[in-house]
Amino acid sequence: MKKPVVEFSRPLQIDRVPALGSRDRLAAEDKECAALAARLGLFKVHSLSAFLTSMPWRGGGLRITGNLQAEFDQVSVVSLEIFRSSIECDVERYFLPPHKSGQDSEIDSDIIQDGVVDLGEVVSETLVLELDPYPRRPGEVFQDIHEDVEPVKISHFTGLLKLKRDLGGGKN
């Protein structure tokens, strides 16, 4: 089976992570930013970086913590104008070997594939979860076009009243 193409790949061999953990600084290059923008539906990714700590966890697993920073352009769903946004958020993910996956229902963990965890993909996935699916420029408010128009109140008896008036039986 062919592995999917990952736009921002930083593979980490879990057996090379020291007992006291490792620290990594990741930064996407321009080409990776362009590929991520296409994948995430953003107009442009200016920068994406993260500081991560990887620690051995639960006998063969890995705990990844840290934070990410991203700066990007996106299109407002209200005005369709491009505007710049930034995100800074925490990263916290857990990985277990396939034979231990699903044994602990308290913590949501991913499966370690072939002894490797892709730190770049961890960062990309965290960014995706932080993006607003309906982005708007700061201060921009969606307004219904017909907001000022009074709704027409129609009664079920309007037709009968009109018929009564037409037949001359009703008051004006």
Residue ranges and their predicted role:
Residues 1-69, 73:
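A positional/architectural concept
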Residues 1-21, 94-172:
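Charge-rich, low-complexity linker and terminal segments
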Residues 38-45, 77-84, 129:
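Short, intrinsically disordered, mixed-charge
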